[in-house]
């Protein structure tokens, strides 16, 4: 009998063990679909990005025109650009859902998988930020100026860091060139870290909605979950293509249709919607260094989740007090996102400050206290 090539060939065997015969808990729900959706988002972004890079010119005098040229003169250039710009939004929607699921079902207890996931989030945020600068519109230019200027808050070496990032004494041609280089390179770094993320995941096995060991009840990934993932792809691509075709600029900023002008400041400088929660936390502290530290902590606090877990149960499902806190925490970034999109004036300042305090208090203080209390109530 001839050996099964899928199981004997060195390369095919790796693919087979990761995507076909992978033992998967039989009861994982639709919340486990977001990992594969993130993979397809990354693939889509790399493909559309490579096509856009072929027509883009990383020069301050030509960048805006080259983007306009791509949309007007390149065959289906408008569609490729719209898919790339809105694909970034869907990428962040998927990753926020993915993190939320990990938080709710206690997946952060797989420490290595969780920590590489947080590194992936930080890399994705860096990639999206440098990408937003490339069209060289007003919001691109001023967003780059404001955010890179935050490095000046670093004691002693701050100003040198800023000038090193800019490649001069202001945001100019060298800045755009290095941002384009980073935006081209980082997605491949994300792909590499994703492989590490999956290696750690397959080492421990996937979590499940019951939070129990599922070794006795596993089924092959294909065809059961591969078909389920294809349904997920369809459910994601339908709204993405609808948005790209019917309302491509819905999530963008009108200021970015104006070429960058260093002499005219927009009335309200703000990043893309998926960064607004962190931007609101940055703005809530009135001095620069404190704001920068809070901005960094808003994402890096996720590294502490495995250390702050005090419950004897893995899941939040059977812990009503923790559930209440979880859904309060879920509502919090929506409030921060709304505040971040508003001008810096009363009452948005105080709302942002209260929401920022609530965000850190829930994660760092209330979750551990509540979990300890629940342990005592359940007599663990």
Curated annotation (Swiss-Prot):
Membrane-topology descriptor: Multi-pass membrane protein
Co-factor note (free text): Binds 2 heme b groups non-covalently.
TM spans (from-to): 34-54, 78-99, 114-134, 179-199, 227-247, 289-309, 321-341, 348-368
Residue sites binding a ubiquinone per the record: 202
Primary localisation category: mitochondrion
GO CC entries: mitochondrial inner membrane; respiratory chain complex III
Cofactor: heme b
Keyword flag Mitochondrion: yes
Keyword terms: Electron transport, Heme, Iron, Membrane, Metal-binding, Mitochondrion, Mitochondrion inner membrane, Respiratory chain, Transmembrane, Transmembrane helix, Transport, Ubiquinone
Intracellular or extracellular location(s): Mitochondrion inner membrane
Single annotated GO MF: metal ion binding
UniProt: heme b b562 binding residues: 84, 183
Residues annotated to bind heme b b566: 98, 197
Alphabetical GO biological process terms: mitochondrial electron transport, ubiquinol to cytochrome c
Alphabetized InterPro entries for the sequence: Cyt_b/b6_C, Cyt_b/b6_C_sf, Cyt_b/b6_N, Cytb/b6-like_sf, Cytochrome_b, Cytochrome_b_C_euk/bac, Cytochrome_b_N_euk/bac, Di-haem_cyt_TM
CDD domains: cytochrome_b_C, Cytochrome_b_N
Subunit annotation: The cytochrome bc1 complex contains 11 subunits: 3 respiratory subunits (MT-CYB, CYC1 and UQCRFS1), 2 core proteins (UQCRC1 and UQCRC2) and 6 low-molecular weight proteins (UQCRH/QCR6, UQCRB/QCR7, UQCRQ/QCR8, UQCR10/QCR9, UQCR11/QCR10 and a cleavage product of UQCRFS1). This cytochrome bc1 complex then forms a dimer.
Remaining remarks: Heme 1 (or BL or b562) is low-potential and absorbs at about 562 nm, and heme 2 (or BH or b566) is high-potential and absorbs at about 566 nm.
Described function: Component of the ubiquinol-cytochrome c reductase complex (complex III or cytochrome b-c1 complex) that is part of the mitochondrial respiratory chain. The b-c1 complex mediates electron transfer from ubiquinol to cytochrome c. Contributes to the generation of a proton gradient across the mitochondrial membrane that is then used for ATP synthesis.
Family designation: Belongs to the cytochrome b family.
Name of the molecule in the record: Cytochrome b
Designated gene of the protein: MT-CYB
């Amino acid at each position: 009998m001839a050996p099964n090539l899928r199981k004997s060939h060195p390369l095919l065997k790796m693919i087979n063990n990761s995507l076909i015969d992978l033992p998967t808990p039989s009861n994982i729900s639709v919340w486990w679909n977001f990992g594969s959706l993130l993979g397809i988002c990354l693939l889509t972004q790399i493909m559309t990005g490579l096509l856009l890079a072929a027509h883009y010119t990383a020069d301050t005098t030509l960048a805006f025109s080259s983007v306009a040229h791509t949309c007007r003169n390149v065959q289906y250039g408008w569609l490729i650009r719209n898919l790339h710009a809105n694909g970034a939004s869907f990428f962040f929607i998927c990753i926020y859902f993915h993190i939320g699921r990990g938080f709710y079902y206690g997946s952060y207890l797989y420490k290595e998988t969780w920590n590489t996931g947080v590194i992936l989030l930080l890399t994705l945020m860096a990639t999206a930020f440098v990408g937003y600068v490339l069209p060289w519109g007003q919001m691109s230019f001023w967003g780059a100026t404001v955010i890179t200027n935050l490095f000046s808050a670093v004691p002693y070496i701050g100003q040198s860091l800023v000038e090193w990032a800019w490649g001069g004494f202001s945001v100019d041609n060298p800045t755009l060139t290095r941002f384009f280089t980073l935006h081209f390179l980082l997605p491949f770094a994300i792909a590499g870290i994703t492989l590490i993320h999956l290696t750690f995941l397959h080492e421990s096995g996937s979590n499940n909605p019951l939070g129990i060991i599922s070794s006795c009840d596993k089924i092959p990934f294909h065809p059961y979950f591969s078909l389920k993932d294809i349904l997920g792809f369809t459910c994601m691509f339908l709204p993405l293509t609808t948005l790209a075709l019917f309302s491509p600029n819905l999530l963008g900023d009108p200021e970015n249709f104006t070429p960058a002008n260093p002499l005219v400041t927009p009335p309200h400088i703000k990043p893309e919607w998926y960064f607004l929660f962190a931007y609101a936390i940055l703005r809530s502290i009135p001095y620069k260094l404190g704001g920068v530290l809070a901005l960094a902590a808003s994402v890096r606090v996720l590294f502490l989740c495995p250390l702050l877990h005090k419950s004897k149960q893995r899941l939040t499902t059977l812990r009503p007090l923790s559930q209440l806190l979880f859904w309060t925490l879920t509502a919090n970034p929506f409030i921060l996102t709304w505040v971040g999109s508003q001008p810096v004036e009363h009452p948005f300042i105080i709302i942002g400050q209260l929401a920022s305090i609530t965000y850190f208090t829930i994660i760092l203080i209330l979750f551990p206290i509540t979990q300890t209390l629940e342990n005592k109530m359940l007599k663990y």
